[in-house]
């Protein structure tokens, strides 16, 4: 279901079980949903080389996106700047003053630098552009009902809605819902 002209509803989607279950719940319960947005980290944008797991991005492009579009959902794949640029980034500000002016080098695993500097920057730009076009916007997030700590931490923003929490879907229930749609 599309929202009115003043309000925009989108799902920031990782194409994991919780994100997909959120989309399916929106469709099942006639919740407004204007667009699903996936942010693809690019290794080499100029040559079209993705930085995502090849099996995942192939599944997103060739299975999930067409299936959702057949269900009437607009799916947009945003592409980040090359993540390789993070290797050459000069640190301008840091909690550790001795790092300022140095080159970051290789991103450390599990430190969220790529998520923060690539995915979140691209999504932030999308949200800023959305705010200029609509009076109100809401972002569906795939956080399950049984993820209480994460819900408390992530739902402080009044623009975010968890349909999994609204309909009391646990992670297991989200997985089962996704299985129904292959």
Give each language-model segment a name.
Residues 1-182:
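Nucleotide-activated chemistry modules centered on ATP-dependent adenylation/adenylyltransferase
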């Amino acid at each position: 279901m599309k929202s009115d002209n003043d309000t925009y509803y989108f799902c920031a989607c990782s194409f994991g079980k919780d994100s997909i279950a959120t989309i399916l719940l929106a469709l099942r319960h006639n919740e407004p949903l204007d667009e699903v947005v996936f942010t693809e980290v690019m290794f080499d944008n100029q040559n079209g080389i993705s930085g995502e797991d090849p099996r995942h991005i192939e599944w997103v492009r060739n299975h999930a996106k067409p299936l959702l579009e057949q269900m009437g959902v607009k799916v947009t794949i945003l592409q980040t700047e090359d993540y390789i640029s993070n290797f050459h980034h000069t640190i301008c500000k840091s909690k550790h003053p001795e790092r300022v002016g140095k080159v970051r080098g290789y991103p450390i695993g599990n430190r969220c630098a790529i998520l923060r500097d690539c995915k979140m920057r691209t999504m932030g730009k999308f949200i800023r552009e959305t705010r200029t076009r609509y009076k109100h916007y809401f972002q569906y997030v795939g956080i399950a009902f049984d993820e209480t700590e994460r819900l408390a931490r992530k739902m402080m923003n009044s623009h975010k809605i968890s349909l999994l929490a609204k309909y009391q879907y646990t992670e297991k229930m989200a997985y089962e819902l996704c299985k129904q749609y292959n």
